[in-house]
Protein backbone atom coordinates (compact mmCIF):
# COMPACT_ATOMS: atom_id res chain seq x y z
CA UNK A 1 0.00 0.00 0.00
CA UNK A 2 1.52 3.28 -1.08
CA UNK A 3 1.13 6.61 0.68
CA UNK A 4 -0.09 5.34 4.04
CA UNK A 5 1.24 6.54 7.38
CA UNK A 6 3.60 4.10 9.10
CA UNK A 7 2.61 2.85 12.54
CA UNK A 8 4.57 1.25 15.36
CA UNK A 9 4.47 -2.43 16.22
CA UNK A 10 2.49 -1.72 19.40
CA UNK A 11 -0.12 0.16 17.37
CA UNK A 12 -0.41 -2.66 14.85
CA UNK A 13 -1.06 -5.35 17.46
CA UNK A 14 -3.49 -3.46 19.70
CA UNK A 15 -6.59 -4.87 17.99
CA UNK A 16 -5.60 -8.49 18.67
CA UNK A 17 -6.27 -10.31 21.94
CA UNK A 18 -6.25 -13.89 23.17
CA UNK A 19 -9.46 -15.86 22.65
CA UNK A 20 -10.76 -19.19 23.94
CA UNK A 21 -11.26 -22.01 21.47
CA UNK A 22 -14.45 -20.80 19.75
CA UNK A 23 -17.82 -22.28 20.67
CA UNK A 24 -19.83 -22.12 17.49
CA UNK A 25 -22.94 -19.92 17.64
CA UNK A 26 -25.85 -20.20 15.24
CA UNK A 27 -24.65 -17.25 13.18
CA UNK A 28 -21.43 -16.09 11.61
CA UNK A 29 -19.09 -17.82 9.21
CA UNK A 30 -16.21 -20.25 9.20
CA UNK A 31 -13.39 -19.85 6.72
CA UNK A 32 -12.14 -23.33 5.91
CA UNK A 33 -9.36 -24.83 3.81
CA UNK A 34 -11.05 -27.80 2.08
CA UNK A 35 -7.71 -29.32 1.11
CA UNK A 36 -6.81 -29.81 4.78
CA UNK A 37 -9.76 -32.14 5.49
CA UNK A 38 -8.86 -35.83 5.29
CA UNK A 39 -12.51 -36.83 4.80
CA UNK A 40 -14.46 -34.48 2.56
CA UNK A 41 -17.91 -36.11 2.64
CA UNK A 42 -18.97 -34.46 5.89
CA UNK A 43 -17.56 -31.13 4.75
CA UNK A 44 -19.28 -31.43 1.37
CA UNK A 45 -22.60 -31.98 3.13
CA UNK A 46 -22.27 -28.46 4.56
CA UNK A 47 -22.13 -27.08 1.01
CA UNK A 48 -19.18 -24.75 1.58
CA UNK A 49 -19.10 -21.71 -0.68
CA UNK A 50 -15.79 -21.55 -2.55
CA UNK A 51 -13.97 -18.22 -2.68
CA UNK A 52 -13.13 -18.41 -6.36
CA UNK A 53 -11.42 -15.49 -8.12
CA UNK A 54 -12.86 -14.34 -11.42
CA UNK A 55 -11.94 -16.62 -14.34
CA UNK A 56 -10.18 -19.03 -11.96
CA UNK A 57 -11.34 -22.24 -13.63
CA UNK A 58 -12.36 -25.56 -12.12
CA UNK A 59 -9.29 -26.36 -10.03
CA UNK A 60 -10.09 -25.21 -6.49
CA UNK A 61 -6.75 -26.33 -5.02
CA UNK A 62 -5.51 -23.83 -2.45
CA UNK A 63 -8.71 -21.79 -2.33
CA UNK A 64 -10.67 -21.16 0.88
CA UNK A 65 -14.38 -21.72 1.36
CA UNK A 66 -17.08 -20.18 3.54
CA UNK A 67 -19.46 -22.11 5.79
CA UNK A 68 -22.55 -20.16 6.84
CA UNK A 69 -23.35 -21.34 10.36
CA UNK A 70 -26.92 -20.08 10.03
CA UNK A 71 -27.47 -22.84 7.46
CA UNK A 72 -26.02 -25.59 9.67
CA UNK A 73 -28.14 -27.76 11.94
CA UNK A 74 -27.11 -28.69 15.48
CA UNK A 75 -25.46 -31.93 14.37
CA UNK A 76 -23.38 -30.17 11.74
CA UNK A 77 -22.26 -27.50 14.22
CA UNK A 78 -21.33 -30.27 16.67
CA UNK A 79 -19.19 -31.92 13.99
CA UNK A 80 -17.45 -28.63 13.23
CA UNK A 81 -16.81 -28.09 16.95
CA UNK A 82 -15.22 -31.56 17.13
CA UNK A 83 -12.97 -30.65 14.19
CA UNK A 84 -11.95 -27.35 15.81
CA UNK A 85 -11.10 -29.02 19.12
CA UNK A 86 -9.23 -31.89 17.47
CA UNK A 87 -7.15 -29.44 15.46
CA UNK A 88 -6.44 -27.43 18.60
CA UNK A 89 -5.22 -30.55 20.41
CA UNK A 90 -3.05 -31.39 17.41
CA UNK A 91 -1.50 -27.90 17.46
CA UNK A 92 -0.56 -28.34 21.11
CA UNK A 93 1.72 -31.16 19.89
CA UNK A 94 2.67 -29.81 16.45
CA UNK A 95 2.15 -26.07 16.33
CA UNK A 96 2.39 -25.63 12.56
CA UNK A 97 -0.14 -28.31 11.58
CA UNK A 98 -2.13 -27.24 8.53
CA UNK A 99 -5.56 -26.13 9.77
CA UNK A 100 -8.85 -27.10 8.19
CA UNK A 101 -10.78 -24.42 10.09
CA UNK A 102 -8.91 -21.18 9.49
CA UNK A 103 -11.13 -18.62 11.19
CA UNK A 104 -14.48 -17.78 12.67
CA UNK A 105 -15.72 -14.50 11.23
CA UNK A 106 -18.48 -12.07 12.15
CA UNK A 107 -19.58 -9.96 9.19
CA UNK A 108 -22.75 -7.91 8.56
CA UNK A 109 -23.06 -9.26 5.00
CA UNK A 110 -24.30 -12.45 3.38
CA UNK A 111 -22.04 -15.38 2.55
CA UNK A 112 -21.82 -14.53 -1.15
CA UNK A 113 -20.59 -11.02 -0.41
CA UNK A 114 -17.99 -12.26 2.06
CA UNK A 115 -16.80 -15.00 -0.30
CA UNK A 116 -16.61 -12.52 -3.16
CA UNK A 117 -14.50 -10.13 -1.12
CA UNK A 118 -12.06 -12.82 -0.01
CA UNK A 119 -11.81 -14.12 -3.58
CA UNK A 120 -10.83 -10.64 -4.77
CA UNK A 121 -7.91 -10.56 -2.31
CA UNK A 122 -6.45 -13.94 -3.28
CA UNK A 123 -4.70 -12.92 -6.50
CA UNK A 124 -1.76 -10.60 -5.86
CA UNK A 125 0.51 -8.67 -8.20
CA UNK A 126 3.73 -7.44 -6.51
CA UNK A 127 4.75 -4.00 -7.80
CA UNK A 128 7.74 -1.71 -7.36
CA UNK A 129 7.30 1.69 -5.71
CA UNK A 130 7.50 3.14 -9.21
CA UNK A 131 4.33 1.24 -10.03
CA UNK A 132 5.99 -1.24 -12.37
CA UNK A 133 5.34 -4.96 -12.03
CA UNK A 134 8.02 -6.64 -9.91
CA UNK A 135 6.98 -10.30 -10.15
CA UNK A 136 4.30 -12.40 -11.84
CA UNK A 137 0.92 -12.59 -10.15
CA UNK A 138 0.48 -15.15 -7.37
CA UNK A 139 -2.16 -16.83 -5.22
CA UNK A 140 -1.92 -15.39 -1.70
CA UNK A 141 -3.26 -17.70 1.00
CA UNK A 142 -3.52 -14.87 3.52
CA UNK A 143 -6.52 -16.57 5.15
CA UNK A 144 -4.31 -19.41 6.46
CA UNK A 145 -4.00 -18.48 10.16
CA UNK A 146 -0.29 -19.28 10.12
CA UNK A 147 -0.03 -16.42 7.64
CA UNK A 148 -2.82 -14.18 8.93
CA UNK A 149 -1.43 -14.07 12.48
CA UNK A 150 1.81 -12.57 11.21
CA UNK A 151 -0.01 -10.15 8.93
CA UNK A 152 -1.71 -8.72 12.03
CA UNK A 153 1.64 -7.34 13.22
CA UNK A 154 3.30 -6.84 9.83
CA UNK A 155 0.66 -4.88 7.92
CA UNK A 156 -0.45 -1.32 8.40
CA UNK A 157 -4.05 -1.14 9.71
CA UNK A 158 -5.34 0.13 6.36
CA UNK A 159 -3.93 -2.86 4.53
CA UNK A 160 -5.30 -5.33 7.07
CA UNK A 161 -8.70 -3.64 6.85
CA UNK A 162 -8.61 -3.99 3.08
CA UNK A 163 -7.86 -7.70 3.39
CA UNK A 164 -10.63 -8.59 5.82
CA UNK A 165 -13.16 -6.28 4.18
CA UNK A 166 -16.63 -6.60 5.75
CA UNK A 167 -15.44 -8.75 8.68
CA UNK A 168 -15.92 -7.03 12.05
CA UNK A 169 -14.35 -9.87 14.06
CA UNK A 170 -11.82 -12.46 12.91
CA UNK A 171 -10.99 -15.31 15.33
CA UNK A 172 -8.02 -17.47 14.35
CA UNK A 173 -5.59 -20.07 15.75
CA UNK A 174 -1.83 -19.54 15.85
CA UNK A 175 0.82 -21.75 17.40
CA UNK A 176 -0.89 -23.19 20.50
CA UNK A 177 -3.55 -20.53 21.14
CA UNK A 178 -6.54 -18.74 19.59
CA UNK A 179 -6.75 -14.99 19.02
CA UNK A 180 -9.28 -12.49 17.79
CA UNK A 181 -8.88 -9.36 15.76
CA UNK A 182 -11.59 -6.86 16.70
CA UNK A 183 -12.72 -3.45 15.56
CA UNK A 184 -11.50 -4.02 12.03
CA UNK A 185 -14.30 -1.93 10.56
CA UNK A 186 -13.51 1.21 12.59
CA UNK A 187 -11.62 2.81 9.72
CA UNK A 188 -13.10 0.87 6.82
CA UNK A 189 -14.91 3.91 5.39
CA UNK A 190 -11.62 5.81 5.24
CA UNK A 191 -9.74 3.09 3.35
CA UNK A 192 -9.64 3.38 -0.42
CA UNK A 193 -10.31 0.15 -2.33
CA UNK A 194 -7.10 -1.50 -3.55
CA UNK A 195 -5.96 -0.78 -7.06
CA UNK A 196 -6.44 -3.78 -9.32
CA UNK A 197 -4.42 -4.68 -12.39
CA UNK A 198 -5.92 -7.27 -14.72
CA UNK A 199 -7.88 -8.95 -11.94
CA UNK A 200 -4.97 -8.86 -9.47
CA UNK A 201 -4.81 -6.78 -6.29
CA UNK A 202 -1.53 -4.91 -6.30
CA UNK A 203 0.80 -5.20 -3.34
CA UNK A 204 4.04 -3.36 -2.62
CA UNK A 205 7.03 -5.61 -3.38
CA UNK A 206 8.62 -4.81 0.00
CA UNK A 207 5.52 -6.08 1.82
CA UNK A 208 5.35 -9.12 -0.43
CA UNK A 209 9.00 -9.95 0.29
CA UNK A 210 8.30 -9.80 4.02
CA UNK A 211 5.33 -12.14 3.72
CA UNK A 212 7.54 -14.68 1.96
CA UNK A 213 9.51 -15.07 5.21
CA UNK A 214 6.45 -15.99 7.28
CA UNK A 215 6.98 -19.75 7.02
CA UNK A 216 10.56 -19.33 8.27
CA UNK A 217 9.37 -17.04 11.07
CA UNK A 218 6.81 -19.62 12.15
CA UNK A 219 9.38 -22.42 12.11
CA UNK A 220 11.62 -20.37 14.37
CA UNK A 221 8.80 -19.49 16.77
CA UNK A 222 7.79 -23.14 17.02
CA UNK A 223 11.37 -24.07 17.82
CA UNK A 224 11.54 -21.38 20.52
CA UNK A 225 8.57 -22.96 22.28
CA UNK A 226 7.05 -19.73 23.55
CA UNK A 227 4.90 -20.21 26.69
CA UNK A 228 1.20 -20.44 25.86
CA UNK A 229 0.45 -17.83 28.52
CA UNK A 230 2.76 -15.30 26.85
CA UNK A 231 0.61 -12.30 25.82
CA UNK A 232 -0.11 -11.76 22.15
CA UNK A 233 1.86 -8.51 22.17
CA UNK A 234 4.99 -10.32 23.38
CA UNK A 235 4.59 -13.12 20.85
CA UNK A 236 4.23 -10.56 18.08
CA UNK A 237 7.31 -8.69 19.34
CA UNK A 238 9.27 -11.94 19.33
CA UNK A 239 8.06 -12.68 15.80
CA UNK A 240 9.24 -9.22 14.71
CA UNK A 241 12.70 -9.84 16.18
CA UNK A 242 12.79 -13.19 14.40
CA UNK A 243 11.85 -11.52 11.11
CA UNK A 244 14.68 -9.01 11.53
CA UNK A 245 17.15 -11.84 12.19
CA UNK A 246 15.90 -13.92 9.25
CA UNK A 247 16.29 -10.90 6.98
CA UNK A 248 19.81 -10.31 8.31
CA UNK A 249 20.73 -13.95 7.75
CA UNK A 250 19.46 -13.81 4.19
CA UNK A 251 20.71 -10.42 3.07
CA UNK A 252 23.78 -9.64 5.15
CA UNK A 253 25.16 -13.09 5.90
CA UNK A 254 24.07 -14.56 2.54
CA UNK A 255 22.47 -17.66 4.01
CA UNK A 256 19.85 -18.84 1.53
CA UNK A 257 19.04 -22.16 3.20
CA UNK A 258 16.06 -22.12 5.55
CA UNK A 259 17.93 -24.16 8.18
CA UNK A 260 20.64 -21.50 8.40
CA UNK A 261 18.10 -18.71 8.68
CA UNK A 262 16.08 -20.51 11.35
CA UNK A 263 19.18 -21.43 13.37
CA UNK A 264 20.45 -17.86 13.30
CA UNK A 265 17.06 -16.32 14.12
CA UNK A 266 16.51 -18.77 16.97
CA UNK A 267 19.84 -17.90 18.59
CA UNK A 268 19.33 -14.16 18.14
CA UNK A 269 15.88 -14.46 19.74
CA UNK A 270 17.19 -16.57 22.61
CA UNK A 271 20.49 -14.86 23.36
CA UNK A 272 20.46 -11.49 21.61
CA UNK A 273 23.67 -9.47 21.67
CA UNK A 274 25.45 -12.11 23.77
CA UNK A 275 25.36 -14.38 20.73
CA UNK A 276 25.73 -11.77 17.99
CA UNK A 277 28.68 -9.99 19.67
CA UNK A 278 30.52 -12.98 21.08
CA UNK A 279 34.28 -12.50 20.45
CA UNK A 280 34.57 -15.95 18.91
CA UNK A 281 31.89 -15.15 16.34
CA UNK A 282 32.24 -11.49 15.34
CA UNK A 283 35.03 -12.12 12.83
CA UNK A 284 32.97 -14.84 11.18
CA UNK A 285 30.04 -12.46 10.66
CA UNK A 286 32.37 -10.08 8.80
CA UNK A 287 33.78 -12.88 6.67
CA UNK A 288 30.31 -14.14 5.81
CA UNK A 289 29.19 -10.62 4.94
CA UNK A 290 32.15 -10.16 2.58
CA UNK A 291 31.80 -13.73 1.26
CA UNK A 292 35.32 -14.64 2.41
CA UNK A 293 33.99 -17.83 4.03
CA UNK A 294 30.89 -19.97 3.71
CA UNK A 295 30.32 -21.52 7.12
CA UNK A 296 26.82 -22.77 7.85
CA UNK A 297 25.09 -21.34 10.90
CA UNK A 298 25.17 -24.71 12.67
CA UNK A 299 28.96 -24.77 12.28
CA UNK A 300 29.24 -21.36 13.92
CA UNK A 301 26.82 -22.31 16.68
CA UNK A 302 29.06 -25.28 17.46
CA UNK A 303 32.00 -22.93 18.14
CA UNK A 304 30.44 -22.11 21.50
CA UNK A 305 29.96 -24.64 24.28
CA UNK A 306 26.68 -25.55 25.92
CA UNK A 307 27.99 -24.00 29.12
CA UNK A 308 28.53 -20.69 27.33
CA UNK A 309 24.97 -20.71 25.99
CA UNK A 310 23.67 -21.41 29.46
CA UNK A 311 25.67 -18.49 30.82
CA UNK A 312 24.22 -15.87 28.51
CA UNK A 313 20.75 -17.34 28.09
CA UNK A 314 17.96 -14.76 28.13
CA UNK A 315 14.17 -15.08 28.43
CA UNK A 316 12.54 -15.47 25.02
CA UNK A 317 11.00 -11.97 25.13
CA UNK A 318 13.46 -9.97 23.07
CA UNK A 319 13.04 -6.31 22.39
CA UNK A 320 14.62 -4.80 19.31
CA UNK A 321 14.53 -1.00 18.88
CA UNK A 322 14.93 -1.41 15.11
CA UNK A 323 11.65 -3.32 14.74
CA UNK A 324 9.18 -1.38 12.64
Task: Give residue ranges: language-model regions.
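A contiguous, surface-oriented mixed alpha/beta subdomain in the mid-to-C-terminal portion of proteins
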Residues: 1-61, 65-74, 85-87, 102-324
Amino acid sequence: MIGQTATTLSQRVERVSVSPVPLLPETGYLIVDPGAFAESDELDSLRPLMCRPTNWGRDFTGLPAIIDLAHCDAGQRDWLAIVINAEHESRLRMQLTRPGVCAYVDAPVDANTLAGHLANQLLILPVEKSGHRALPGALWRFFDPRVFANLCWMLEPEHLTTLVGPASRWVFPWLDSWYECNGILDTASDVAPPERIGGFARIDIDIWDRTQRIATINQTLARLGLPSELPWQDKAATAAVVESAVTEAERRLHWKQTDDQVNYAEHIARYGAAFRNHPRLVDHWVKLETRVETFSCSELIALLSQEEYEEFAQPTRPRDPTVR
